[in-house]
């Protein structure tokens, strides 16, 4: 059974890595892999509790998926109402080096609240308006991708992996920001400083200045600003909600989406002269959410959960403990692998291999110094968050932003 499950996972992940050559969406492969792994585990595992384990794992995975669906809807709603124009339209500098620094810093902080792919798309759209040279665009785009990945690494809502670690209780929002903000910022400053050497200290000459994006029909600046404030405020509300109530973050995100949904419905109900077809209601925006990505996360996370239920991840963790026994090396290898392999299954696998160590387990451990790294907010979780996030910048295929 173990060999069969390993072969299914390796073959499935190989197909995911080659999705562009195979011309098969990775979500379809992930769902098939998930179904195959759980079927093999059920038929050959001889475990009467397999149904219960499946429900428990699906519950944990669904929390992450509901969080992502709500967050993606909020971001899409802001974008549909031109909310991000408030940020991009205030960039007035034309000096290329100043523009590079400005774009990298804005991207860094935006991706801490939004997901890194959305942030990258917004900044690349702005870049195309301001920089005409193809080679210079590549340099600017590379810095933007690095800044987006680094910005998502220090925020509990900035990347799927940080969301996973935060929601499962591996890290807390306050210490995550406190420990990783400076390392993440340095990981942006150094590449930007190097890239500046390849950018001439001169003003940009955009080819088309009339291509600046305009607000959607019947959406005024005031309405656009309100949607932006409510949306971003709702995203920032989630960590506060979890800290105050102790309830799961996905519930706070659902509340934020509900508030924004009610607000936009009330506004559109008062726009009697506006055609229904051009109203960006949430029910319409939901049709444009990237559901294949959500289904990919469902398939890949449940596939890793199957390996965990089979005991494979625990066995691999024991192997690393005996032969490596060094959290810096394990996290570093994970970071390097994230340049080639999607960081979501990598982080999910590490979470399955190393459960959060509580006080009782730490006290009874034969090596409490080593196990201290795996407590909540332990050094391993912060290293894993940073390495998996920033490591995706090493290659263009290493992250969704790239």
Regions found by a protein language model. Give the residues of each.
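Short, amphipathic, aromatic/basic-enriched membrane-interface segments that mark the entry/exit
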Residues: 1-3, 89-95, 215-227, 373-374
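Membrane-interfacial helix-loop connectors
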Residues: 37-47, 58-59, 110-147, 151, ...
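Transmembrane helical segments that form the transport core of multi-pass membrane transport proteins
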Residues: 81, 103, 234, 238-376
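Core mid-bundle transmembrane helix pairs that form the ion/substrate translocation pathway
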Residues: 176-264
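Flexible loop linkers connecting adjacent transmembrane helices
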Residues: 81-92, 205-212
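Hydrophobic alpha-helical transmembrane segments
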Residues: 6, 31-32, 65, 100-105, ...
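Hydrophobic transmembrane alpha-helices of multi-pass solute/ion transporters
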Residues: 5-77, 86-94, 250-302, 312-324
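Alpha-helical transmembrane segments of multipass membrane proteins
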Residues: 13-17, 35-39, 108-109, 193, ...
């Amino acid at each position: 059974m173990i060999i069969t499950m390993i072969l299914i996972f390796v073959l499935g992940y190989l197909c995911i890595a080659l999705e562009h050559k195979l011309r098969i969406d990775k979500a379809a492969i992930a769902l098939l892999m998930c179904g195959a792994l759980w079927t093999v585990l059920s038929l050959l595992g001889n475990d009467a509790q397999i149904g219960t384990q499946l429900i428990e794992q699906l519950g944990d995975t669904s929390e992450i998926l509901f969080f992502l669906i709500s967050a993606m809807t909020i971001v899409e709603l802001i974008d549909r109402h031109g909310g991000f124009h408030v940020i991009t339209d205030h960039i007035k500098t034309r000096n290329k080096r100043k523009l590079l620094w400005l774009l990298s810093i804005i991207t860094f902080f935006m991706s801490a609240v939004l997901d890194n792919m959305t942030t990258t798309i917004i900044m690349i759209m702005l870049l195309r308006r301001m920089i005409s040279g193809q080679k210079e665009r590549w340099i600017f785009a590379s810095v933007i991708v690095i800044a987006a990945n680094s910005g998502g690494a220090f925020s509990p809502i900035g990347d799927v992996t940080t969301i996973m670690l935060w929601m499962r209780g591996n890290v807390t929002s306050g210490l995550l920001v406190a420990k990783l903000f400076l390392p993440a910022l340095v990981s942006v400053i150094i590449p930007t400083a190097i890239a500046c050497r390849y950018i001439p200290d001169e003003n940009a000459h955009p080819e088309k200045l009339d291509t600046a994006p305009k607000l959607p029909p019947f959406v005024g600046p005031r309405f656009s600003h309100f949607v932006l404030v409510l949306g971003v405020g709702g995203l920032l509300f989630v960590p506060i909600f979890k800290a105050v109530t102790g309830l799961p973050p996905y519930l706070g995100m659902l509340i934020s989406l509900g508030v924004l949904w009610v607000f936009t419905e009330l506004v559109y109900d008062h726009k009697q002269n506006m055609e229904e077809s051009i109203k960006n209601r949430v029910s319409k925006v939901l049709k444009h959410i990237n559901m294949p990505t959500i289904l990919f996360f469902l398939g890949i996370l449940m596939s890793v959960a199957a390996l965990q239920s089979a005991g494979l991840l625990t066995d691999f963790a024991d192997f690393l403990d005996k032969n490596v026994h060094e959290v810096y090396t394990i996290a570093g290898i994970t970071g390097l692998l994230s340049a080639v392999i999607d960081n979501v299954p990598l982080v999910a696998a590490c979470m399955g291999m190393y459960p959060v160590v509580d006080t009782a387990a730490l006290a009874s451990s034969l090596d409490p110094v080593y196990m201290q790294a795996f407590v909540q907010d332990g050094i391993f979780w912060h290293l894993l968050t940073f390495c998996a996030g920033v490591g995706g910048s090493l290659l263009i295929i290493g992250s969704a932003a790239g």
